[in-house]
From Swiss-Prot:
Residues 1-19 form the signal peptide. Its main location: secreted. InterPro entries: Pectin_lyas_fold, Pectin_lyase_fold/virulence. Its EC number is 3.2.1.157. This is Iota-carrageenase. Keywords: Carbohydrate metabolism, Cell wall biogenesis/degradation, Disulfide bond, Glycosidase, Hydrolase, Polysaccharide degradation, Secreted, Signal. It comes from the Bacteria. It catalyses: Endohydrolysis of 1,4-beta-D-linkages between D-galactose 4-sulfate and 3,6-anhydro-D-galactose-2-sulfate in iota-carrageenans. Transmembrane segments: none annotated. Gene3D superfamilies: Single-stranded right-handed beta-helix, Pectin lyase-like. Belongs to the glycosyl hydrolase 82 family. Hydrolyzes iota-carrageenans, sulfated 1,3-alpha-1,4-beta galactans from red algal cell walls, with an inversion of anomeric configuration. Also active against hybrid iota-/nu-carrageenan, not active against kappa- or lambda-carrageenans. The gene is cgiA.
């Protein structure tokens, strides 16, 4: 579907109300209001398409480079050669309908891939299981910055099929040090692979070496991992996300937790716009989680959650302290930190750096005390945040099963509904159960350290039982404290 963009006159974006609100059924209508139903923007604010001279230079991967698009051999070297050949003058490279096996495809400046409708892209067979693998790389792991590059489905959507590979560590596109890019028009068939399928990445190079000015749109994904999903944005400026859909996981995860950004003291996201973000049977369509990064403004319109835990999840920024003493256990490190900051100051202890180091997350109420403490073991680390942001036209539909639930969410599900939940088995990752509500916002919304405002307006809430807590805040009382041991296994 092609976006119909309208010109804008104030900055690069305008949000306009058209039409009326839908009928709302909810036990708490205080947050329901008339909201915009479409986010309209000038396409040129995000991406400039190739000019006529570039479009006139066309090559075909099969007829010009001899790729067999019917076998199962690795086609990466020939595709990389074709991209390199076109990069000097710029051009369009067509991948005719067929099957291609690809890995480590290096995108270059002024090269635009047009992949015909119905084409299937597979990761190369026999990839090393323990390593991370990228099909397309927009200057994330390569050295040079690139400009003016795109991958789009031609005539309809192509397919990226991640299923059945020897490696579960699969990334469809890693978008790094690139300006003016577009990724559009395909379907991802997943099987809960590790990583979000599209990473909007920080690169630890000189300057602001991360994505600027781009569009990611018209992509749907099936069977995503709850801990990942379709998109994760670490660092980006002036990006539009449009018409994205995911089954499972998180569709648009604005979680800026790349540790390289913490060391470099730069990165994060600014001027992010999104519209038509949907998730079915997942965790949530939209997630804000700044970790340690100070991020800019995010504007989102038209969010749909069907059978998800929540439609919008907002997490406070936090201080994360690493165990430089390499203690033997999580409890030992927790006791050390709480000996400095006081009982209850550690929210959770977990492993970072590929399981090599204990990390303690400081509880939100202790952020100020930790930041200003005299002990250098805990002081001086500032929790992250977003600038005041907006999510409008949120639609949440209840389903009695299929939602992916974090353990911490279960306290807000009435005890009478616990029979609808099953716990992870040996191969599981998350609890499964009913939709829980519309929003969960763990920020104090007072602009103290790690806290910020995401203003959410809802246009349609359907099917939730009357005793559900639809909008959970940081101080919402828990409604069920039953032991989780009685919940039966999903497997």
């Amino acid at each position: 579907m092609k976006l119909q963009f309208k010109p804008v006159y104030l900055a690069s974006i305008a949000i306009m109300a058209i039409g009326c609100t839908k009928e709302v059924t909810e036990n708490d209508t205080s947050e329901i209001s008339e909201v915009p139903t479409e986010l309209r923007a000038a396409a040129s604010s995000f991406y400039t398409p190739p000019g006529q001279n570039v479009r006139a230079n066309k090559k075909n991967l099969v007829t010009d480079y001899g790729v067999n698009h019917n076998d199962q051999n690795d086609d990466s070297s020939k595709l990389n050669l074709a991209i390199k050949d076109l990069s000097d003058t710029g051009g369009i490279l067509t991948l005719p309908k067929g099957k291609y096996y690809l890995t480590k495809i290096r995108m270059r400046s002024n090269v635009h891939l047009e992949i015909e409708k119905g084409t299937v892209i597979y990761p190369t067979k026999g990839l090393t299981p323990a390593k991370n693998h990228r099909i397309f790389d927009f200057a994330s792991k390569t050295e040079e910055k690139i400009e003016n590059a795109s991958i789009v489905g031609k005539g309809g959507k192509f397919i990226v099929d991640l299923r059945g590979n020897s490696s579960k560590n699969q990334i469809v596109a890693d978008v790094g040090n690139v300006t003016n890019f577009k990724i559009s028009n395909f379907t991802i068939k997943d099987e809960k692979t590790i990583f979000a399928s599209i990473l909007v990445s920080f690169t630890d190079k000189a300057g602001n070496a991360w994505p600027h000015k781009g569009i990611i749109e018209n992509i749907d994904q099936a069977n995503a991992h709850t801990g990942y999903g379709l998109i994760q944005a670490y660092a980006a400026d002036n990006i539009l996300f449009n018409n994205l859909s995911c089954t499972g996981g998180v569709t648009l995860r604005l979680e800026t937790d790349n540790l390289a950004m913490k060391t470099a003291k730069k990165g994060g996201v600014r001027d992010i716009f999104a519209t038509k973000i949907k998730n079915t049977n997942g965790l949530t369509p939209v997630m804000f989680s700044p970790h340690f990064m100070e991020n800019g403004k995010v504007t989102i319109d038209d969010v749909t959650a069907i059978g998800c835990a929540y439609a919008v999840r907002v997490e406070h920024g936090f201080i994360e302290i690493f165990d430089k003493g390499n203690r033997a256990s999580a409890d030992a490190f927790k006791n050390y930190i709480e000996g400095i900051l006081g009982a209850g100051s550690v929210e959770v202890v977990y492993k970072r750096n590929n399981g090599r180091t204990w990390a303690a997350r400081i509880a939100n109420d202790f952020n100020e005390a930790a930041y200003n403490h005299s002990n250098p073991a805990v002081s001086g680390i500032k929790p992250g945040k977003f600038a005041t942001s907006k999510v409008t036209n949120v639609k949440a539909t209840y389903k009695g099963t299929g939602a992916k639930l974090k353990q911490a969410f279960l306290s807000y599900l009435p005890c009478s509904e616990r029979s609808k939940v099953c716990r992870p088995g040996p191969d599981g990752f998350e609890y499964n159960g009913p939709s829980l509500g519309v929003t969960i916002d763990n920020t104090k919304r007072d602009n103290s350290l790690g806290n910020y405002n995401v203003n959410v307006s809802t246009s349609s809430v359907q099917g939730f039982p009357n005793n559900y807590v639809l909008n959970v805040k940081y101080n919402t009382p828990k409604v069920c404290n039953q032991n989780l041991g009685s919940i039966t296994s999903c497997n």
